[in-house]
Amino acid sequence: MLSCASVLQCGSPCLFREQSKAVRRTALHDAGAKLMFALFFMATTGLAERHEFSRPLMGMAFRIIVHSENEAKTKRAVKAAFDRVAVLNQIMSDYEPESELNKLSNLAGSGKVAKISDELCRVLDRAQALAVETGGAFDVTAGASIQLWRRARRVKRLPPQYVLAKALKTVGFRGLKLDAKNCTAELTKPGTRLDLGGIAKGHALDEALAVLKKHGLLQALVSAGGDIVAGAAPPGKKGW
């Protein structure tokens, strides 16, 4: 610290240098205080990091992105979300021979009324509502014809017209008699095959996101086959 006499001797440039040093000391002190606060905040609240996971489910890759500060908690939640999708696949897949959906399709035309799970009942109820709204453009009873076109794509040859005509006779959403209150269903037309490809994936995405939210992971995004559902935006962003 300079004396008044020293200041008078060195003149105003000396005084300016001393003032600049004081300003720098104050700035460094403030910066240090802010850094200490930031370190304390991070230590006590954690820092949300981006985590990405992927698992093959429903014949495609299901991808989950979450922002979380707890890695162990995140892994538990993501596993639960993937497990939920796996359960839904066992219910609604038309590829799995022992799925609940295929077991119902196997009863088509038998006159038997099947008791179905609440899960399948809920999805079929929504599918039937969409069929009515679209005048039959959306129809989950089109499985037999869809299988023909899948095969045509594999072998690169169109199905014969008579085979296609036979499959089309099995299609018609009114041939699915659903009692949504008691969760029973009957397929009245022989040969009808159910295909939930237009609705099952979206339902699975919604359910996976719900599981993540239940575990406290609100900043999450789930995607599969081009479809996406999203929760809260990542930290510091307005959206995904």
Predicted feature locations:
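Cationic, low-complexity basic patches in intrinsically disordered or flexible, solvent-exposed regions
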Residues: 10, 19-20, 35
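Short linear motifs centered on Gly/Pro in flexible linkers and helix caps
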Residues: 25-26, 223
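Basic polycationic patches enriched in arginine
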Residues: 17, 24-25
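Mature catalytic core of soluble alpha/beta enzymes
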Residues: 37, 43-240
